[in-house]
Amino acid sequence: MGAVKIFNRSKGLNTKDDPARIDDNELSIAVNVDVSPEGRISRRKGYSSIFDSGCHSLFSAGDYMLAVVSGKLSMVEKDGTISVVTDVVDSHTIRYQMVGPVVYGISPSIKFIIKDKIFYPWVVGENNGVTTDRQFYAPPYGQLIAHHSSRLYIADGSVAYFSEPFRYDLFELFPGHIPFGRRLSLMAPVADGMWYADNRDAYFISGMDPAKDIVMRKFSGAGAAEGTGILIPGEKVGSGRMAGSNVVAWCGKSICIGGPGGYFKNISGEKLELPNANTGSGYYHDGRLTFCLHSY
């Protein structure tokens, strides 16, 4: 009697159905394994430790990395050399946005600029334009930062503030903001608008100028855990129909993708039940999305 093949390829995780009822090619649990696009299961590759001090708020700035190491904002070179940038940092997570060669950093307690590897406070600039009675302020503290259509956006609680075009040191806080109902956990740009989310729902706001009338679409139940948003080249998603623009992926109760024009898709399907999470992180490399979720 010839061999009978009972397992050809894995469909991945199924955490919603009873393990006794899932298909033969589904997994009820997976620890440190990869499932290839062809359904092959392999052990996940290991990693090398660069330093063993407690760290958080990691950000790649090209030829160096920023991170809070032992409570201090530090610069980590490619060879693992660590130098302290500033020690005026507490336990809050820092979010970063790179515009050209300049890194802008924000948290609920610190805001700064790093240019040519030098730390500067992020303060209000001078308005050198036409005479105006408008009142400009320094950027607010906040939990999220993003860049879109020549403006920097900062989320402080449930409000998204935006800078003047090409003047990232000038914020007209009123009326220069977009209010939401709950604390924002995602803020990410695509070609023709911005994606936002709180812990329950997601929103797409179309248009390039937030100072003008905006159109908002709501996607109920598509909330994000703060920190999980990732920008991905559009040609890497699906059939490549969104080539030329970024799309954003995030993770909450489901794994979602948002693209230009309000394109939305839940890619975790009906068989993956994720735990409740307040915060997390996301990573995209070599065609793979990786999310880490944290509940507290």
Which residues does each PLM region occupy?
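Short, surface-exposed beta-strand-loop junctions and turns on beta-sheet-rich folds
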Residues: 73-74, 80-83, 111-112, 119-121, ...
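Short acidic-glycine loop/turn motifs at beta-strand connectors
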Residues: 69, 77-79, 107-109, 114-118, ...
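Beta-propeller fold detector
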Residues: 83-87, 121-126, 172-175, 213-220, ...
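Repeated scaffold domains used in trafficking and secretory/extracellular systems
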Residues: 51-59, 88-101, 129-149, 181-189, ...
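N-terminal beta-propeller domains
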Residues: 1-81, 131-204, 208-209, 293-296
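Beta-sheet-dominated scaffold domains
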Residues: 5-10, 182-296
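Hydrophobic or amphipathic alpha-helical targeting/insertion segments
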Residues: 95-127
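Hydrophobic beta-strand segments that make up the repeating blades of beta-propeller
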Residues: 65, 103-105, 194, 247
